Amino acid sequence: VARMTEALLNGGVQERVSLPHKDVPMPRAQDAQERPAETPAGETNSAPGMPRAVGKRLHRVLEVGTGSGYQTAVLAALVDELYTVERLEPLMKQARKRLRELGCRNVQVKLSAGGIGWPQHAPYDGILVTAAAVELPPALLEQLAPGGCLVAPVGGPAMQELRRVRRADGGFAYERLELVNFVPLILDN
C-alpha cells in the first residue's frame, strides 16, 4: 500500500516528503517485516514501507478500508481532511480508538461498505482503495473531484493490477502501475 499512497499523493509531483516512520507505531506483527500483516479480523494491514515517501499535501481524501488504522494515521499527517470507511465494526472501533490516542483530529471514521464511499463529504482530491474490485465502483469515481486521483487494485482473485485514475476534461484517464495482490473489496455489508 505504500506504493498506492505514493501513487496517490506523489503522482507527477517533484517535491517529496519523507515521514519519520517511528511517529506512527506499527502493529506488532509488522515490526521488522516488509510485508502486510493480518489483523485479528482476518483482513490485512499495509506493508510498513508503503507510506514512507509521499508527496504534495491534498485537502480532502477518502480511504476505503481503514483496517487497523495504521495507514490512516500516516495519511492523516499528509492531508487536511481524511475520511475513511471500514466495513468491519471491530476494526472500525479499534482504528477509531488508535487514531484518537495518536491525536489524529483531521480523521473521520465510518462503518460502511467500501464500494459506496462516503458521498456526503465528496468531492475528494484523492481516493485510496485498499481492497481489490473486479471493476472500479462507479460511486467512487463519481466522488472524485476534477483533477483528483484515485488509486486502487483492480482485478479478480488470481491477478490484480494497481491503477491510478485521474479525473480530467470531463472524463477519466487510467494508468496501470504494477501487479499486486489484495483482499477483495466487499461492495455491501
Q: Which residue ranges define each predicted feature?
A:
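Conserved nucleotide-cofactor-binding alpha/beta core module
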Residues: M50-A168
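Active-site capping/gating segments
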Residues: G155-N189
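Conserved Class I S-adenosyl-L-methionine-dependent methyltransferase catalytic core
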Residues: V1, A41-A47, R52
